[in-house]
Amino acid sequence: MVSATAAPGCLLEQKPVSKSLSDVTYHNQIARLLQRHCVECHREGGVGPFALDTYEDAVAHAPMIREVVDRGIMPPWFAVADKSHSTSPWINDRSLSASEKQQLFAWIGNKTPAGDPKQSPVPRSFADGWLIGKPDAVFEFAKPVKVKATGTMPYQNVVVDTHLEKDQWVQAIEVRPGNPGVVHHVLVFIQSADKEDGPRDDAADERSGYWGIYVPGNSTLVYPEGYAKQIPKGARLRFQMHYTPNGTATEDSTRIGLVFAKEEPKHEVRVAGVVNAGFRIPPGADNHQVVASIPSVPTDIQILAFLPHMHLRGKAARYDLISGGETRTMLDIPRYDFNWQLLYRYAEPVSVKAGDTLRFTAWYDNSSGNPANPDPNKEVKWGPQTQDEMHLGYVEYIVPGSKPGDPNPLSPRGRARGAIRNFFGGSGSPEPNVGDALFQKLDADGDGNISRDEVKAKYNNNPAASTTIFDRLDTDKNGQLNRKELRRLSEIIGR
């Protein structure tokens, strides 16, 4: 369990509401409203603490519903509305419109009339509990993971064999914890069939991206026709599990369900992380800003979705696109909630041109005024546990004109390749080995080792060079790169 500085929340009080809209009943309006915004979680077997899919359920929880809706706690949705558009740009926007709130408050204020059952919508159904429908394949842990009663647990990495006999294109993914009460989040990565305990694949690090995901508020990835992710023949799935003990020793066996595309897609869906892993948040800082970017995107892309990820001190987040000297805010979250790490999916993909910059900015509250802060007297840096912090701006995207299976331009490998090209001012290194060529350029003091500061000095416009890429090359973790370690760059960029 993670301690908080103070107990968050306040007493619930009933507020008087207008008794206008007296014709609003459960069956003619409220049932539909709850189906659209609430029932996906608040149903039997859902992640919500109680169901809201019947009249009796809605009436029993009416005072609480009004309070949490009025305070903006529910439904969980934190993006600022784009006032330049009449409709939300987000296809999964859970927020209630002003008219929907009026209807809900009027119904509760008028003593929750039931109305005519004939006007009620058809109840939503969920196939065998799977939100994505019946999966074509389900993979589960070979044996449960034991979760202790108290304290913290390091991330558990569980590898599951798929035994797939051919490459598959996947149109829908759902991660289902066996014990949701102790699973805070899950990241799933693809691991090649020939890798056991050796170096992880390019994506097997939360800083690089994810293949599948389970976080509070999001357990599915569903793509329209023509869009899919690939899982290779014989691949393994690496589940990175973040468990949060809840006072009782227990165990968990998580599953993942996949729905295969009927044919090869037109677009391969990819994920990149906009990351700053080198930040330090001072003790007591109540609005500490951290910035990361992908400068000069190497090729045209279309963004499908964003998923910002921070921990308990996360306060606010924003994605910006810098193009032609102008800055455009793409997603603004002034009130970030660690308990609801939501995916924000565009109704229509948004184009980003080669040379544009994607920037992810986050603000952190490490003060005693943050009731969820475990320790306001501590300097905080990057780390895997909840009491540590992260600065991760995930971007889900496609590359127009590329073929499924082509190299990923925003992966660490793709970005390293682009950084090397830019560094040499051309299409690549003139040397047989990129690492040897770089060593000569980076070893400014001639001591035979490359420090993080030396890399930062040469790549000051590319934070990934001195963080993500540096860490991947520093195999002995001594904070220095020797010539042998830097030669591994040839493997990373495919030279």
Tell what function each PLM region has.
Residues 1-6:
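Bacterial N-terminal signal peptides
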Residues 8-160, 164, 172, 176, ...:
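Aromatic- and Gly/Pro-enriched helix-to-coil junctions and flexible linker segments
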Residues 26-27, 107, 439, 470, ...:
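Conserved hydrophobic/aromatic "anchor" residues
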Residues 128-403:
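His-enriched metal-coordination microenvironments in redox/metal-binding proteins
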Residues 395-434, 440-442, 495:
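Extracellular/periplasmic ectodomains of large secreted or surface enzymes and adhesion receptors
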Residues 432-446, 466-478:
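Primarily EF-hand calcium-binding motifs
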Residues 449-463, 483-494:
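Amphipathic regulatory helices of Ca2+-sensor modules
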